[in-house]
């Protein structure tokens, strides 16, 4: 990491970083270097093609990044500056990220769906010197207390400068945020090499090659979106297809049109695709691999999607902060693919914590809150905010889940540390409730949250979006019918919903995850 900046992180020591380089987990190659290599090796290949029909070959991408870098330098960008980017997913955002890197500056990535309150909080926390927006967000940015340029203004700027020196692979290159399912986000600090390690693992697990065609449908600035739309396509030299905003129909159409081989999505998006008639109307047979993660994967829609497309669904378990702890591979069985988060990754050391204080090592029991050290982790939160919560006392980075690890090293998520419904003194896993509820054919997406109860303290409330088959039929679903279905399947009575709320669309965070914080407020349990 940069020697002149104290990022205040216990994530790894200098000796550990040297080891990661020595064994090849980390690289001396930057993303900017990889773009230049692609411009030579795959000059005429499409690098990015977006929903507007705009696209750049790798040679054009490299040239565009250089042109934007000199204009950034002309606008005053200097090495070490923090440049915020509030921009829709398109070819332009990836060119801009590389141009900022070539100026030696640091990207502050902001989700396109973020509101001005969230943007203002990220700008203040990151101390960004400049905000660059697309035209759609430029007017909203006018009231923010930072110098602002639209991407069009930057591209048209006449003043040029000399950029650089560009960042190295161990330098901080990006600051993004937690995806904000509860409260305002915290800023997470990233080096390129943590994502280079993740990239190598994805290539091995999915048997990826430069000939693959990627379709990442997670917002670019967030962890899952970052490696699937930016770092891995660039390091591979493959083509990435970009959508402005996810819909099931648009995704299926893009797969068919571009003969996509690698789809990258959170499990909610995959479930929505299966519930949409578009998944049967378009030819999805080109798909070979689906990378998913971020939330528990419902078995039924996942198995149906594999049967429909012939693709294999691979899961990663981890977070924006920790990177990957476990993953499935093409060699795993169907049950391992769809029932677990995969086997613990050999290069990542993982321990389980529990006990009354949550700080007791309970790894031998096979169940607890995971924490890790290794080459995939971020540096944690900017300025060490909440590091006492993120890290254990001896420097292991925590996940916010409760997990089980079996004798073969496969990890399963049983719920979040804060995602339990405490009914009459019994902890009920919201993830287990959701997985059970999702077996009903009328339900496309479900989210379980606690609701207040004078007798039991909390009861199980489930919010659902209906599948297309339900909307074209009766158009609704009654609690009694859902409970009857679950009992017929033998679902434990403690997992039965006690309130069912059907809504058109579940609220989602900037990162695309279901915003349970909002649902808890709606249910009267904030």
Model-derived features: positions:
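Conserved AMP-binding/adenylate-forming
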Residues: 54, 69-114, 427
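N-lobe entry segment of adenylate-forming
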Residues: 1-56, 60-75, 485, 526
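Conserved AMP-binding A3 loop
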Residues: 55-59, 173-197
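Conserved pre-ATP/AMP-binding loop-to-beta segment of ANL
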Residues: 43-44, 160-177, 184, 207-213
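Gly/Ser/Thr-rich phosphate-binding loop
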Residues: 260-265, 274-336, 349, 356
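Conserved AMP-binding/adenylation subdomain of ANL enzymes
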Residues: 196-213, 221-262, 276
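AMP-binding/adenylate-forming catalytic core of the ANL superfamily
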Residues: 131, 263, 318, 368, ...
